[in-house]
Amino acid sequence: MAQYELLHKELPQVTYDPVSRILKIEKKDKKRSGLIAVCTAGTADIAVAEEAAQTAEFFGANVERIYDVGVSGIHRLLSRLAVIQKANCVVAVAGMEGALASVLGGLVSRPVIGVPTSVGYGANMGGISALLTMINSCANGVAVVNIDNGYGAGYLATQINRLGVHDEEA
């Protein structure tokens, strides 16, 4: 926060989001296109998800946030499936065992980017268990970024979204 305050004195247009820990300067009235769905398994994954969502918005995408829809309460995910299926790309952020990316990969026909998080307990191993689950997924169309890499997922999702927007315009 101290870095933000110092920078904000020199650049008053700088904003800081304490949840995602993103510091940014954005153009006003930015045009956004397409749609990316950013989903979390649990509420503990929201910080990384917000990093992905805000990165995608910064680079020009519309983002639908769908939080706390993990496999332990699959009915919550299924109740939001129609919205998720409209997206050009889906970002699945999950700690613990990381199953959300595989489940989404089996339910949607769009690319899914798995983001393992370091949250969890027991044999979570700082996100390694979620990472291994995601990279060993048998669901087609699932790609995985590194542990807690919301920025990387948001940027990649934006590139995929642009391809979808281009296809819609053609």
Where are the predicted features?
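Glycine-rich phosphate/diphosphate-binding loop of Rossmann-like nucleotide-binding domains
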Residues: S33-G73
